[in-house]
């Protein structure tokens, strides 16, 4: 029996979100297994996976030789290897790049569509899950395994949980929370990631940005002490030579349409508007507010005014829940 996804509804902000069970169809799971899996993935991503415990998950980037990101990966350990979650739109291309050198190593790299990805967020999310699982993750133990399920804990923008589980458990959870929780699709989790300042790399922006342009260094996603990995030289140069002039920003306001990933924005300059930046993700909330995640210059004034191209409405900068000070 397959897992049935949930119908879409406009997402809510984290401050007003009722208990919600979220089908993460726009995200996808992959795995690497085999005796060389740690060594192999360590040579491909920006984070130091050798230091990662069974109780941690990490955000990392997989880059090309020029340090541009194919995608960002949410990595965690599994039985004899690792699993990661990324945007579904980039998975196929990312796996193709990751497999390029796999012939020389004892690894198996594969997509995993057998398991289901679910999010649980909103009012009393922890209490709701405590009725289903014997143990839940927290700030100390960010990853917990319970039977067929792996649960990941997220602090921002408010406590939430990501479940990697089998179809039977996904259906059981849906039944248990039915009537108590709202059901929503990936747009709700996307809205929470945008609020949290977690970079969203879809196909339109794959191969476009170095990790620091999306604040990955502030999210613990780059190790400057580990050994070689693809793109390391460019990523290191951006740090030690100050070559990176961009950052990820959160904007909120109104617009007559929801812009697409890859579009630019317009910045108000006196009487005029100048094109700037690149949108990573955008979504409209149930109160009509538009949230936009964009890569722009890192020296913008906090009072800067933006708009979706040629739109009559405006957007403003919202502080992120972490600091970019190094």
UniProtKB/Swiss-Prot annotation:
Annotated keywords: Cytoplasm, Folate-binding, tRNA processing
Gene3D superfamilies, alphabetized: 2.40.30.160, 3.30.70.1630, Aminomethyltransferase beta-barrel domains
One record GO biological process: RNA modification
UniProt entry tagged with the keyword DNA repair: no
Location(s), subcellular: Cytoplasm
Pfam families assigned: GCV_T, YgfZ_barrel
Keyword presence, Cytoplasm: yes
Residues given in the record as folate binding sites: 27, 189
Major site of localization recorded for this protein: cytoplasm
MF GO annotations: folic acid binding
Any single GO CC term annotated in Swiss-Prot or TrEMBL for this entry: cytoplasm
Similarity comment: family membership: Belongs to the tRNA-modifying YgfZ family.
Function: Folate-binding protein involved in regulating the level of ATP-DnaA and in the modification of some tRNAs. It is probably a key factor in regulatory networks that act via tRNA modification, such as initiation of chromosomal replication.
The protein's name in its UniProt record: tRNA-modifying protein YgfZ
Organism: Salmonella paratyphi B (strain ATCC BAA-1250 / SPB7)
């Amino acid at each position: 029996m397959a897992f049935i996804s949930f119908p879409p509804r406009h997402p809510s902000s984290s401050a007003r979100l009722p208990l919600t069970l979220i089908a993460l169809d726009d995200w996808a799971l992959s795995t690497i297994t085999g005796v060389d899996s740690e060594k192999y993935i360590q040579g491909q991503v920006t984070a130091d996976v050798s230091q990662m415990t069974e109780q941690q998950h990490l955000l990392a980037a997989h880059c090309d030789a020029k340090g541009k990101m194919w995608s960002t990966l949410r990595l965690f350990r599994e039985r004899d290897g690792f699993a990661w979650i990324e945007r579904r739109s980039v998975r196929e291309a990312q796996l193709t790049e990751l497999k390029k050198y796999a012939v020389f190593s004892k690894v198996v790299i594969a997509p995993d569509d057998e398991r289901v990805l679910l999010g649980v967020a909103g009012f009393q999310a922890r209490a709701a899950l405590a009725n289903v699982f014997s143990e839940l993750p927290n700030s100390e133990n960010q990853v917990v395994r319970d039977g067929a399920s792996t649960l990941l804990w997220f602090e921002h923008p408010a406590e939430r949980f990501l479940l990697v589980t089998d179809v039977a458990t996904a259906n059981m959870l849906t039944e248990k929370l039915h009537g108590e929780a709202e059901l929503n699709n990936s747009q709700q989790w996307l809205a929470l990631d945008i609020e949290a300042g977690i970079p969203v790399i879809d196909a339109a922006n794959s191969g476009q940005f170095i990790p620091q342009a999306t604040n990955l260094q502030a999210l613990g996603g780059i190790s400057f002490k580990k050994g070689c990995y693809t793109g390391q030289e460019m990523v290191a140069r951006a740090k030690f030579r100050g070559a990176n002039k961009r950052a990820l920003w959160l904007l909120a306001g109104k617009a007559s349409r929801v812009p697409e990933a890859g579009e630019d924005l317009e910045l108000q300059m006196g009487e005029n508007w100048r094109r700037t930046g690149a949108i990573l993700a955008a979504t409209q909330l149930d109160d009509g507010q538009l949230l936009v995640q964009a890569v722009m210059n890192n020296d913008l004034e906090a009072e800067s005014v933006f708009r979706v191209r040629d739109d009559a409405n405006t957007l403003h900068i919202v502080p992120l829940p972490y600091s970019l000070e190094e």
